[in-house]
Amino acid sequence: MNPATMTRQLSSDGRMFASSIITVIPDSSPTAAEAIELSSPLSLPSPTSLLDFLSTSTSRGPARSDTDGDKTQGKEVLDTKPILENSFRRENRVVSGTGGKAATGKKLKRRTESPGNVCQSEIHIVPGERIILRQTRPDKKAAKAKRTKKEDGLINRKLYGRVSKANQTVSLQPETKKSAPKGCNDTTQPADNGHINDLDDGLQLEQAIQRRLDWTPTKDTTIPVIDLVGDSPSSCEKSLSGMRSTRTMLSNYEFSGIVGTLGGSRSEGTPDAPTTKRPVELLKVNNLKEISGLSDSRQSSITEDSESATSKPRRVKAKNPPKSKLTTITSYATAKYTVVEKSVDLDPVETLLSDEPGKEKNVAKRTSGARCAKPGRKKSATTEKKNEPPIFKVVPPLEAFKAFDGQELLFGTSSQLANGHSEDRHEQNEGTSHISNSSAFIPLSRSESSSKAPSQTSLGSGFLKLSSSKNLWSAGARDLTGAVLEIDEIDLSEHWMKPSIFESQPKAPLGCKADTQIPPQLGEIDFDNSCQKPLAAIDPPELVTQSETPSEKGDLHKYIVKPTHINSCSQSGSSISVGSPEKPVQDKPIFSGFTTSELAKKVAAYGFKPIKSRDKMIALLEKCWENRNKTSNSVPKLTPGDGLSQVDESTQGQSLGQHLKPNSIPQTATTQVPKVKPDKRDTKSQGVPVPSRRSTSTSKVSRKRTESPSAILVDDDQRSDSTGDSVPPSRPRRPSKSCTPRDRQKSPESFNLPTIPLTIRSGKIPSTGTASETLPSLSTQITAAIKAQPRLRAFNGVKQPTWYEKILMYDPIQLEDLAVWLNTDGFERIGEDREVCPGLVREWCESKGVCCIWRKQRGVRAHCPLVRA
């Protein structure tokens, strides 16, 4: 058979690899080819079958096969080696077998005719019964390359493996898409294939760079802009220039390029606008441009009108930012404490709550002036004041703890935890505290007059600048028999009505207690009215008896005068005329209708310590009031001690004011009244004042008698408040404790009653004033005692907070408990010898903004001061 025929048959049947066709081309007759049967198109024939096939083929044509085989054996092996080296990493495959005889030098070869087959395989029969399969390239490779060259010259390079993967994608694209990059690079295809490859190698690098730039995201975004502008895509240079032009166009809308010009134009358009409304970073630029704008505006009035019109709405807009400052929680919380920002409507409230109303008014004027002033500059001044940093700062914890040491106790809304306190009573307390803080101390002068004369060591405590402090020890100190002890000399030079009050208090020993009676706030009586009445009605002989305990302020002394004292004092023999002795009985207050706090005040006014039971307080007050009225009815017969021990000072002042006669004032002016401390029994029998010498001796004797714990303590030092300082009182821990004999020793000196001023002076008064000035106020002493309290040990695992810790935690403070602690333990730690009463403690709490309550109230009637701005 013809080998060509066998070649066609094998080409149709024998495909041994997926990528290429391996053809067996023996030189035997074609019938032998038919004997070869491949198991599968992708598998090689077995060696035995090939040997059988070859053996048959060689037997048919031995001469031709031998000659050809010898030639081909040496030739093909040498020829195929270099070709196999350039193959696609396919190793030579050797098939060895032990089949029948095989003719040496036989060569089986077939060429693939299909253009898709790039490589063809050959089987070489080598002597030694081996079959070698080799791959060789077709001889007509150049012709096939020319066919592919027409489509694209890059395909050959792909076959050789010289090109990157990117080139493969380009070769697969249609010619229309390739035209753009060719146009950009301005390249032409050469006719020669080798020249094309060289040129492509050089251009591929440039195209790869450009395409890589195109692949970046930034370049992709700019490409559509170039299309919109209409740049021709033919040349890359034009496209780049178009991109740059578009960038410059877009840059006009960017922030960096336009801010300076716009800011200058705005400033030129509105030269009259205030500088505060302009950005801070553009002030210098705007100022320079404003000058040119002003010159331009002068040239044309129309521009000025337009500029003014534009500037007005801008000014209105500038007013809005300060309003937005109050949108934070901190601004709302602190707005009420900033005085400048408060409106004029709130000024009356501020004046009521503030100790210095004058300052509030000034602030109100400032705010009103700021509102009236509409110009931008004035308004900016007010805004600068408002924008000033607050007084308080957020400091580190260590500095905050240090600040507590030097900080006075002042608390805000904690005082409103208990709300039982009525507004009327609060206003009354505010007024009394304000008066007490003032230098005049007018409402307190009554108690001050009685307490001022005694020495600093005398009984009673002068509570400086605290009206309630005068109330606790206002009752006179008494001995075992109930007689009132005399007090030191008092200077009443400040008021002409003071000596008359003292005359109404006939007994020198009684004067001490009478003078220290309840201040107007505690007694809840209009002392001013009651004071004026008794002064007009005082008899001249009665003035002599009263020389004992007048205070420097006549108004208070009037109130303090007790009818019992007047009755008991029968020193001059002249009796005080009482208009109607039954009136005090009619004026008997209904103690059951009083609040517990009011009852406690009245009990404290008599010199008794606080009583827990409300019923006991009512019974005690009723008994004291009845005893006082009885003594007033039988004035000439009563002993000094009987009525004084249970007298209500506030009511005594009223009764005296009604019954005293005014004739006594001129007579007392010319007379010298010796301060007498006669024995209580002697005063009863005599009814006439004893000379000063005798009074001194009797006072010494009475001192010894009066040194007993049963007498009631009196606040003698309240008189010193008029001078501005408090006198250290002896500690009256028992309500019945008597005044110390020191009071008598200081009082036995005679008083000189001047004509019109009616002032009683003693040589010891200046010394008392100087000594009292050195003493610190009880308010500061209370603060120091509370801070000096050490930490308490836990009781049964429960912590016991100190008073200072309770205040910091806004716990309502019980006035009675705090007063007891101060009198027992608190003042001892700081070396204070004076004592305080719950009323004084309440005044201290109100001044410091501490929430305080009375013991039995349980928050119903809480005496908590409102927050003071």
Swiss-Prot record:
Chief location of this protein within or outside the cell: nucleus
PTM comment text: Phosphorylated in response to DNA damage.
InterPro entries reported for this sequence: Slx4_ascomycetes, Structure-sp_endonuc_su_Slx4
Region (Disordered): 40-79, 92-116, 165-199, 293-323, 351-388, 418-437, 630-774
Protein's GO biological process: DNA recombination; DNA repair; DNA replication
One Gene Ontology cellular component annotation held by this UniProt entry: Slx1-Slx4 complex
Subcellular location: Nucleus
Keyword annotations from UniProtKB, A to Z: DNA damage, DNA recombination, DNA repair, Nucleus, Phosphoprotein
Pfam families: Slx4 (PF09494)
Biased composition (Basic residues): 312-322
Biased composition (Basic and acidic residues): 63-79
Skewed-composition ranges (Low complexity): 40-59, 688-700
Subunit composition and interactions: Forms a heterodimer with SLX1.
Physiological role: Regulatory subunit of the SLX1-SLX4 structure-specific endonuclease that resolves DNA secondary structures generated during DNA repair and recombination. Has endonuclease activity towards branched DNA substrates, introducing single-strand cuts in duplex DNA close to junctions with ss-DNA.
Similarity comment: Belongs to the SLX4 family.
Protein name: Structure-specific endonuclease subunit SLX4
Gene name of the encoded protein: SLX4
